[in-house]
Amino acid sequence: MTPRGPDAAGVWSQGRVALGHRRLRIIDLSEAGAQPMVDSDLGLAVCWNGCIYNYKQLRRELGELGYRFFSHSDTEVLLKAYHQWGDRFVDRLYGMFAFAIVERDSGRVLLGRDRLGIKPLYLTESASRIRFASSLPALLAGGDVDTRIDPVALHHYLSFHSVVPPPRTILRGVTKVPPASLVAIEPDGRTTTTTYWEPDFTRRHDRADWSERDWEDAVLEALRVAVDRRLVADVPVGCLLSGGVDSSLIVGLLAEAGQHGLATFSIGFESVGGVKGDEFKYSDIIAERFETDHHQIRIGTDPMLPALDGAIGAMSEPMVSHDCVAFYLLSQEVAKHVKVVQSGQGADEVFAGYHWYPPMGEPAAASVEGSVASYRQAFFDRDSAGVGELVTPAYLLDGDPSGQFVTEHFARAGAATGVDRALRLDTTVMLVDDPAAKERGLFRPEALDRLLADPNGRLTPLRGNELWQIALLELWLQRHDITGAAA
C-alpha cells in the first residue's frame, strides 16, 4: 500500500477513526503541512489528496474572520474553511480534491470529492466498519473486500470504453464517491450522500447574439484565469508540449503569466514502417519561441512490454487506452525533473471535438430518444446483445442497463440539445484521466474550472479484437491478486 506520495508518511487515530497518508510535497514543503493534519483548537483532523487553487484568497478571507494559521498549506485552509462554513465550504473551493475530515468531539466524518471527479475516492463497507482510500488497490490491500465482479458494472465496462460510472466499480464490494458529492458518516454509522454541484448546460440567452470574436475573447480570458489559478505550487511546474494547438496555447499562456525558463516535455517513439514516431519539429518551434527548458523524451520499443505490468498495477480501475503504457513511461521520465506538469488536454471535451459529437448535432438527435440512438451508435462499443456474446451466463442480465443509464441521464433537465446532453454525460461521467499518470501524482489537469474535464484516450490497443477489454480486465485482476475469471 506504499504508492501515492514519496515524500513523507503519517498516521493518526482517535477512537473509532484512523487516517493514513503518504505525501507528495507541492504546497508548503515544511513539516507544518504534513498529513494527517490535526487542528487541536478547532477539534478537527483531515487527510486529503489534491490542490486548492484559490487557497490564498480563502486564507485571507478566513484571516479577516479571526482565524490564525500555523502553516502555509492549503490543507490548513481546508480545515478552517470547514469549521467556518460547514459542509457547504466546498462551494467556495476551486481545485481538485478528495478529502476526509474528522470532528474530534462528535466523531462525525465527512468525505468529499471535487466537482469533476479529478481526484478519486473509493469506499468499502462491512457490518462493522467503513474504509475509504484514494485508490481501489489500497482497499484490496486491507483485505475483507467482496471481489466478485459486479454484472451491471461489467455491462457498462464493455459498453462504455471500459468506463464504469459511479458509484459502481468493477468489484461488488467497492464503490466510488461520485464527483461533486459529499458523504457524511455519522457517529452511529449512518451515511448520507449529497450532490453539492451540477453543471448547467442550458444555452444562455444573453449570449445568443455573440460573434465568433466574442467567443474567442471569452474562451481566452477563461483560459487565462484557469492557468493563473494553477500557479500555486511551491515546487517547479513543467508542461507537456506536443506541438499541437492545445499544449502550445498553454505554454504561451504560462509565458504570458510570467513563467520564465519553463520546463517542457515532448515524447517520441521509434519510427515504424516509414511512419515517423514523433512530432518534435512542431514542439521545437514552440519551445524556441517561448524559450523553454525543453526536454525531448524518446521511448523505444524495448521498454514498452516490460512496463505493461507497472502501468496496469498503477490503475485504480481497469482502463483500456492506447497510450496508457506510454504515459506511464512518460510520467517516470518527467518525474525525474519536476513533480507537477500542466497539459493542454481537455479541449475535445469542452468543444465537442470527438467523433461522436457531430451526429449529436443532427436533427435526428434533437429529441431525447434521438439523442440516445445517435449516442449509442457513435459511442457504444457494442449493444447489449454483443455484451451477452462475450460473458458467461452468470453475468447475463435482463434488459440493457447501459442503454437505460444513458436514457435516464439524457432525460434530465438542463440540456436541451443532443450535443449538450452528450457533453454533460461525458463531462460528469464518461471522461476520466489516464490512471497510470494519476497514480504517480504527476499530472495536473489543465482544464477550465467547471467546464473542462479530464482527458480519456479511448482507442483500443487491439483493433478488431472483441476480447481486448476482457483481456485488460483479466490482467488487472491478476495484477491485484483477485482470483476467478472476469467473465
Place the predicted regions along the sequence by residue:
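A mobile, often basic/glycine-rich helix-loop segment
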Residues: 351-377
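Flexible, active-site-proximal loop/turn residues at the rims of small-molecule/cofactor binding pockets
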Residues: 347, 356, 477
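Cysteine-centered catalytic environments shared across enzyme families
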Residues: 1-315, 327, 393, 471-479, ...
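Conserved adenosine/adenylate-binding substructure
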Residues: 16, 29-30, 45-46, 94-101, ...
